[in-house]
Amino acid sequence: MIRWALPVLLFPYHAGACGLGLIFAIDVSLSVNDAEYELQMGGLSRALQDRSVLATLEQIEGGVSLALIQWSGQLDQEVSHPWRHVASRSDLSAFAHDIARTKRAFATETAPGSVIDLASQYHDQNPHACQRTVTDVSGDGVQNTGPRTRLSSAMAAGRGQTINGLVILGDDPDPEDFYRHNVIAGPDSFLEVATGFEDFQRAMRDKLLRELPSIVAQN
């Protein structure tokens, strides 16, 4: 079932501006075992605390808003970490430490279209009006249930949102082509490739260092 970690607002409420609203959509489907889940969460936590990522964040006017959704089957998504405004190294470190302690929510089918739909709506619940809105979908497999991923991505892109991908290689069929042609969409969207779960931290760091400077350049 879809679980929200805080009440859903009936209309957007914006408390202030920010440079980037970024949702991490983390795959916890059945193809991801518990050790691989830990590599994802630990890798994301460490990537957020990377010295270069922290230095780039400090240059973003208004800071960033971050959230994390775990996703699996069509009705299996959880907003595990609601929107949090991050404007300093200590803010980002606190968010990263919370991610490292996140308990796994699901282990069912693979419905990337469903999490893209949820994330698109959840951007509206961000209490800060962000200059750019991005959803990062990471995963190791192709869709096997839920709405058509390409359509969900196109609808989110039509709202001005960007959907980036971080694909983890190693499954059969190869998910890279699926992510490249069905997941990524919107302004300046791109795909980052991890050669396996052990490479997730490096790929996440590189993805962040590609996303964040584009916001700095627009400030």
Predicted segment positions?
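Second-shell loop/turn segments in exported
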Residues: 25-35, 66, 82, 98-109, ...
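Short beta-strand-loop
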Residues: 63-98, 175-182
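Von Willebrand factor A/integrin I-like adhesion domains
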Residues: 168, 173-218
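N-terminal signal peptide c-region/cleavage motif recognized by signal peptidases
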Residues: 12-14
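Von Willebrand factor
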Residues: 18-82, 93-138, 164-175, 199, ...
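VWA/integrin I-like adhesion module and closely mimicked acidic/polar interface patches used
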Residues: 141-182
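Surface-exposed patches in mature extracellular/periplasmic domains of secreted proteins
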Residues: 51-60, 108-109, 127, 131-133, ...
